[in-house]
Every structure is written in structure tokens, then in C-alpha cells.
């Protein structure tokens, strides 16, 4: 089964995606990351109001295979946390680009988005790995 990378999203090489809605970025992990992790058993996310910095860890995802840090693709303030994936981590695999989003961030520096890639570029990155 081919993994999907929706074209309306932006991606980073640490396997997070960004969906921009005005000055808010919805951040989650890609289908590739979910596939590589396997069965997800824990998701640790920051609280609302937390300031995150581009390139820094903002949480973690634990699976039966590994514990992986989540890296902020941009800087800003966390304005919403998806408590549903914290309470039911396995649900992240069901819809990573929809109900499986992780956090929403008020974008501090729109220039941060210049370092993201298209779905096509991200697909080339992961398919070449």
C-alpha cells in the first residue's frame, strides 16, 4: 500500500507535517513516520501556552519499536493540543493528517515555512531512504 502525502500540506525532514490556516499551523506526523514507528503506545505533547522553538523537541511518540522525539518545524505558541491522541495513542495511525493532528501553534515567524518542502519533495526524500 502506497503511503499518502497530501499536497496541501508542507513537510520537514524530521517527518512532521504542517497545515497552515491563517496564522495557525496544525502540526502532526506523516504517514511515513507512523508506518516506521509501528504500534504507537504513548504520545507526549506540551501544554497549551507553551512556546516552542523551530528545530527543538516539543514532545515524543513511543511505539513498541522506539521512542522518537517530535521536532518543531516552526516557532510559536501552542494554542491547542489534541488530547484524543494522548488518551488513545493508537488512534494516531488511523488518520495522521486529520483526526491524528498533534498540536496547533500560532506562527511566530512566517519565514520558518520557507524551510519546509512540498509533498512531492517529501515523497522523494522518504522513498529514497
Swiss-Prot record:
Alphabetized PROSITE patterns for the sequence: BIOTINYL_LIPOYL, LIPOYL
This protein's UniProt keywords: Lipoyl
The keyword Iron-sulfur belongs to this UniProt entry's keyword annotation: no
Pfam families per UniProt: GCV_H
Regions annotated as coiled coil: none
One GO cellular component term noted in the UniProt record for this chain: cytosol
Cofactor note: Binds 1 lipoyl cofactor covalently.
GO terms (BP aspect): glycine decarboxylation via glycine cleavage system
Cofactor: (R)-lipoate
The Lipoyl-binding domain, residue ranges: 24-106
Post-translational modification N6-lipoyllysine, affected residues: 65
Function summary: The glycine cleavage system catalyzes the degradation of glycine. The H protein shuttles the methylamine group of glycine from the P protein to the T protein.
Similarity comment text for this entry: Belongs to the GcvH family.
PANTHER family (alphabetical): GLYCINE CLEAVAGE SYSTEM H PROTEIN (PTHR11715), GLYCINE CLEAVAGE SYSTEM H PROTEIN-RELATED (PTHR11715:SF3)
Quaternary structure (record): The glycine cleavage system is composed of four proteins: P, T, L and H.
Name of protein: Glycine cleavage system H protein
Organism expressing this protein natively: Synechococcus sp. (strain JA-2-3B'a(2-13)) (Cyanobacteria bacterium Yellowstone B-Prime)
Amino acid at each position: 500500500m502506497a503511503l499518502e502525502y497530501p499536497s496541501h500540506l508542507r513537510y520537514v525532514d524530521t517527518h512532521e507535517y504542517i497545515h497552515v490556516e491563517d496564522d495557525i499551523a496544525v502540526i502532526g506526523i506523516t504517514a511515513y513516520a507512523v508506518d516506521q514507528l509501528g504500534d504507537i503506545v504513548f504520545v507526549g505533547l506540551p501544554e497549551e501556552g507553551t512556546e516552542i522553538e523551530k528545530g527543538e523537541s516539543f514532545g515524543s511518540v513511543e511505539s513498541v519499536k522506539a521512542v522518537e522525539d517530535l521536532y518543531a518545524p516552526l516557532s510559536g505558541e501552542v494554542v491547542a493540543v489534541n488530547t484524543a491522541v494522548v488518551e488513545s495513542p493508537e488512534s494516531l495511525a488511523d488518520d495522521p493528517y486529520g483526526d491524528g493532528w498533534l498540536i496547533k501553534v500560532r506562527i511566530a515567524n512566517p519565514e520558518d515555512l520557507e524551510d519546509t518542502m512540498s509533498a512531492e519533495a517529501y515523497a522523494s526524500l522518504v522513498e529514497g531512504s
